[in-house]
UniProtKB/Swiss-Prot annotation:
Changing residue 337 to G: Heterozygous mice are viable and healthy. Results in early lethality at homozygosity. One of its GO terms (biological process) is glutamate metabolic process. This is Aspartate aminotransferase, mitochondrial. It catalyses: L-aspartate + 2-oxoglutarate = oxaloacetate + L-glutamate; L-kynurenine + 2-oxoglutarate = kynurenate + L-glutamate + H2O. The gene is Got2. It comes from Mus musculus.
Amino acid sequence: MALLHSSRILSGMAAAFHPGLAAAASARASSWWTHVEMGPPDPILGVTEAFKRDTNSKKMNLGVGAYRDDNGKPYVLPSVRKAEAQIAAKNLDKEYLPIGGLAEFCKASAELALGENNEVLKSGRFVTVQTISGTGALRVGASFLQRFFKFSRDVFLPKPSWGNHTPIFRDAGMQLQGYRYYDPKTCGFDFSGALEDISKIPEQSVLLLHACAHNPTGVDPRPEQWKEIASVVKKKNLFAFFDMAYQGFASGDGDKDAWAVRHFIEQGINVCLCQSYAKNMGLYGERVGAFTVVCKDAEEAKRVESQLKILIRPLYSNPPLNGARIAATILTSPDLRKQWLQEVKGMADRIISMRTQLVSNLKKEGSSHNWQHITDQIGMFCFTGLKPEQVERLTKEFSVYMTKDGRISVAGVTSGNVGYLAHAIHQVTK
């Protein structure tokens, strides 16, 4: 300690006798970043942090969009465990993937989305690249639009849309516009408003569509409504940009959930599509996704693929290996694929059951409100229709956490806490 003290004294003396040392120290203390302001907290992560600090044993976190089992625990699909075991037994290397990703994964993803017998796949007039989950697919797609979609910089999002859509497209250099989608009066789809707004969008603009399980509302168009939307899109010559983060997870049927995408293609509309395996395979942390562009012909697809690779190279060079191997193993193994589809249906069915039980318990509580929208909506999320002040009461009085707009993740509801949730909602809405 004495030696350390002496060295500090000597350092101070040196600085006093040598002004240059003091100036250097002062220069090191300055910063390039004094003008950088503290950014706003992420609204969903903020909910989670508040939940963690709460000591109430009955607390519920309904903000996070991750599936939980009926005990409220994270769920790793048995089919994923089997795929991991098969991969481990092969003692494979950990070499870089190509820029476009794992070939068998890309092929299987396109088949899952479009259907194995789709004309697009048979003719080869498509390109699919592996991406860093759905967010990466969106960013790659947005960057491709910014560079090559020469007709317009406007991307029209449904109101509301997933919160990350806006910064993804904005940071890629696109401009954001909106069209009516959710009707707060009915807690349902504003079909007439959406159709009217879409029909007024300038020709050759980009229209973003949620393929299924709209996030955050859980409100989806019916097939006959999708048909009318597709008709307007074709008439107005709009570019349909599909985000499909929940295939199979919405209804429990992957083909049903992909119906809108396939219908648009059948109508001669060349779309692009973002996929994620975070929800339907539970591969949240593996970051597994895909981006597909449907083209005029195979030659055009090759040109598009070449440019996608040029875009990806400076973004992240190449995508992660492990998650793509897991997904490809499941999708290309008949037994594992069958098991996985059953597990996806099981997850979807549990969420549907929780919706039904919540409404049933609200009726038992004596609520006079119409809660039918809870069972009408689909997928992981539910727009409850709760007002911000009611959400605040739920948090303060009952330790029930959700985003301020009243969105809840139904996956966070279990048979053990659904009664408590119904009681809490009734107390703040009666």
